[in-house]
Amino acid sequence: MDSIYPLLRECLRGTTPPLVVLPANPVEAQRLHHHFVGKPAPGSALIMTTSGTTGTPKGARLSAATLRASIDSTHTALGGPGRWLLAVPAHHIIGMQVLLRSLHTGYPPVTMPIDDGFQLAALPDAITELLEGHHTQPQPQSQPQTQSQSQPQRRHYASLVPNQLDTLYQDLHSSRPDTRRTAEKALHACAQLDAILSGGAPLPQHIDDYLTAAGLTIVRGYGSSEVAGGVLFDGRPGPATQILSLIHI
């Protein structure tokens, strides 16, 4: 993962040719690449493959300015920049933005192995590493910083898709004591995060309600690959989002 960080830094600066992001699986990568047509338009920094939920996957062109605006908007909506846990595939925008947010703010992410699928039992150790690990300081700003700016309170986040939260919910209600114990440990670990950003699909309300009552801070994001991630957070527009009313048009 470290090998791609220099390329991603250049993407955020807009100083590199467009970086095309494809899955590590060569068969899947070739299948998706087959759908790419033409050359990226000028100003492209990153080409992300859409999920294909509503049709054939395609390459979404994202500029460096769009990526940075999404990063700042997300962190503002969550309460400030922080350190992130990567527990979703990085070839989707939800995972890629975890890496980009981390690079943009200077906090190295913690990567949770998911090659064999999401394992709830691995979540507590990953979150412990997230909470206890050292972080690099953000790059110095062009203007003098106040004490509160130069030593920001570290926050901790994770991006999880609804299926992962559903796994937690289902295992908490399992008839198997060992499964419940594993889920309870994961729940306790998740409760130590400042926020869990859920996106990629709708989160059932009963799961949101249950996990929130159990101590988790869940922020439901809504967006797409084409807009570099979330534009609404818990139904409210992020700072980089403008709502256009078409009622009178």
Residue ranges and their predicted role:
Residues 2-14, 74-75, 93-105:
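Hydrophobic alpha-helical segments in the ANL/AMP-binding
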Residues 45-72, 79:
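Conserved AMP-binding A3 loop
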Residues 1-38:
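Carrier-protein-dependent adenylate-forming modules in NRPS/ANL systems
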Residues 33-49, 80-83:
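Conserved pre-ATP/AMP-binding loop-to-beta segment of ANL
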Residues 171-234:
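Gly/Ser/Thr-rich phosphate-binding loop
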Residues 50, 247-249:
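Conserved small/polar residues in nucleotide/adenosyl-binding loops
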Residues 64-69, 83-167, 219:
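AMP-binding/adenylate-forming
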Residues 240-247:
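Conserved beta-loop-beta connector loops within the AMP-binding
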